[in-house]
Amino acid sequence: MNNFYIKCLKSKKVESGSIYGQFVIKSLHPGQGITIGNLFRRVLLSDLGGTAITGVRIAGVRDEFSTIPGIREDILEILLNLKGIVLKSKTNDLKFGRLKIKGPAVVTANCIQLPSEVEIVNPNHYIATITTSNVLEIEFKIESGTGYKLAGQTFCKKSQDYLQIDAIFMPVQKVDFKIENIYDNSNDLTERLFLDIWTNGSMSPEEAVSSASRFIISFFSSLLENKLPQETKESENKTLSAPKNPHTNIAIEELHLSVRAYNCLKRAQINTIGDLLKYSPEKLQELKNFGRKSADEVFTTLKNKLGIVLSN
C-alpha cells in the first residue's frame, strides 16, 4: 500500500472574486493518478453543497417579461444579475432576504437584508440602477443544495407568486488536473497528480478538497459497512438507459448571449441547452424577432463553448 499525501502548493484570490488553489498528490502507483483525478473532479463539481437565491418576489411585477418604471434594467436583466450573487450559509434551512431602496440609487448585493447566518461573498455585485425617486422592493427566497438546479426544481409549487431563478449551488467553478511520472529514491516509477481548483469564494480550495475527501471516504465506508442487496432477476434483465447529453440541463444563461438573442429564446420557452437542441438551424431562425445575426451568435457560441453543432 503506497503512502501518498496531498499538499497545497498555492492559494490566491483572482480578479473575478474567485479563489484559486493548486494541490499535488505524490507517491501514487502508475495508473492511480487518472483514477483519483477523475474522482476528485467529479465530486468537487457535483457533490459539494452551497447556497443560492432560488426565487424573488418583486413589488408590482407579475412575470419576468415586465418592466418597472424608473428602473434601468428590465426584469430579465435583474434576474440574471441576482443569479450572480454568491452566498454562504451556516445552515441548510430555507431562508428569506429583503431589499427596499428608494432612488435614485445604484443597487448592489450589500443592499440586501439577510439573516445573520447568511453572508454575501461579493457584496459589490451589481443588481440594478434606479433612475428616479421610485422604490425597488424585492423579497428573496434562499435555499441550499448541490449542483445546478433549473427554475422550478428548487422549491414547492405553492410559491406561485415568486419569479424563479436557476440556482448555481456549486461552490467549485472549475477543476483541472494533470499527471507527471517521476522516479522515487528506489528508482521505482511513481505518479504525481496536480489539482487546479477555482471556487466562487464561498469556500476556499483547501476547504473544498477537505469536503470532497470526507465525501469520498463516507461513500466507500458505506460499501464496507453495509451488505449490498441481492439483485433480482428483473433488475438483472433491465438494460442501461442511453447516456444523456451532459449539457442538456445547462441553462441558456450560461451561454452569455446578447440581450436580444436571449430574450427571443426565453419568449419561445427555450430555457436550457436541451430545449435548444430540439431546434434545427432553419426552425430557430423562424422564431419571432430572431434574425440571422442572432442565429449566427447562437451557433458560434454553442460550437465554441460546448462543441455542439445544431443538426438540420
UniProtKB/Swiss-Prot annotation:
Segments for region (Alpha C-terminal domain (alpha-CTD)): 243-312
* A GO cellular component entry from the record: chloroplast
Which SUPFAM superfamilies would you find in this protein's record? C-terminal domain of RNA polymerase alpha subunit (SSF47789), Insert subdomain of RNA polymerase alpha subunit (SSF56553), RBP11-like subunits of RNA polymerase (SSF55257)
UniProt keywords (A-Z) are:
Chloroplast, DNA-directed RNA polymerase, Nucleotidyltransferase, Plastid, Transcription, Transferase
InterPro entries recorded = DNA-dir_RNA_pol_insert (IPR011262), DNA-dir_RNA_pol_RpoA/D/Rpb3 (IPR011263), DNA-dir_RpoA (IPR011773), RBP11-like (IPR036603), RNAP_asu_C (IPR011260), RNApol_insert_sf (IPR036643)
Q: Write one Pfam family the protein is assigned to.
A: RNA_pol_L
Catalysed transformations (reactions) = RNA(n) + a ribonucleoside 5'-triphosphate = RNA(n+1) + diphosphate
What does the record give under GO molecular function? DNA binding; DNA-directed RNA polymerase activity; protein dimerization activity
One record GO biological process: DNA-templated transcription
Please give the subunit comment from the record. In plastids the minimal PEP RNA polymerase catalytic core is composed of four subunits: alpha, beta, beta', and beta''. When a (nuclear-encoded) sigma factor is associated with the core the holoenzyme is formed, which can initiate transcription.
The record describes the protein's role as: DNA-dependent RNA polymerase catalyzes the transcription of DNA into RNA using the four ribonucleoside triphosphates as substrates.
Assigned protein family: Belongs to the RNA polymerase alpha chain family.
Q: Domain comment text?
A: The N-terminal domain is essential for RNAP assembly and basal transcription, whereas the C-terminal domain is involved in interaction with transcriptional regulators and with upstream promoter elements.
HAMAP family documented for this protein: RNApol_bact_RpoA
Descriptive protein name: DNA-directed RNA polymerase subunit alpha
